[in-house]
């Protein structure tokens, strides 16, 4: 990767811990972590730590604490003496201004590795366009439908041949790749 460390981030639906599980509005908190890399680091070397971080962060107490931290930031922005259009722009910048800048994002609702569920199908339909935060070099959206995991990756650095490189990396980890395609947007 040409880096000594990478940051990864993910967001979680917090409607359950806020006591409004059926609310029709967006209620999320975002987490970020850093992984130190060595010259020959492989995904298998650190994925169990990533999994442990995610499981710990998705506990109700952690989600409430992070949601409170983020709401405090929103309140501070709202208290600024600035025109509404400036405040709206700050809100639109979201996690970038909030300090959650990452090399890649894990984005999902529930468990992306479960078989197709109505909730997951609705999520992928509602959020079929996903843009990584400004400052991120690439963004990753992962979903699972009928046992097939789909990764949509936006390569903001516009590095040619990324699909082929990703295929090679996955196959080195013994992961079958059905298709890897560079799409123009």
Write out the residue ranges for each language-model feature.
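Acyl-thioester-dependent acyl-group transfer interface
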Residues: 2-185
């Amino acid at each position: 990767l040409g880096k000594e460390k990478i940051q990864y981030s993910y967001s979680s639906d917090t409607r359950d811990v806020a006591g409004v599980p059926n609310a029709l509005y967006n209620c999320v908190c975002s987490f970020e972590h850093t992984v130190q890399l060595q010259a020959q680091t492989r995904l298998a070397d650190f994925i169990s730590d990533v999994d442990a971080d995610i499981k710990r962060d998705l506990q109700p107490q952690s989600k409430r604490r992070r949601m409170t931290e983020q709401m405090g930031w929103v309140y501070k922005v709202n208290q600024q003496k600035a025109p509404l259009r400036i405040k709206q722009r700050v809100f639109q910048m979201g996690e970038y201004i909030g300090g959650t800048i990452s090399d890649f994002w894990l984005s999902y609702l529930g468990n992306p590795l479960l078989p197709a569920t109505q909730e997951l199908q609705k999520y992928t339909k509602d959020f079929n366009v996903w843009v990584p935060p400004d400052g991120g070099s690439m963004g990753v959206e992962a979903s699972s439908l009928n046992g097939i995991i789909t990764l949509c990756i936006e390569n903001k650095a516009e590095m040619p041949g990324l699909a082929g490189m990703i295929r090679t990396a996955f196959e080195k980890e013994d992961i079958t790749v059905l298709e890897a395609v560079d799409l123009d947007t």
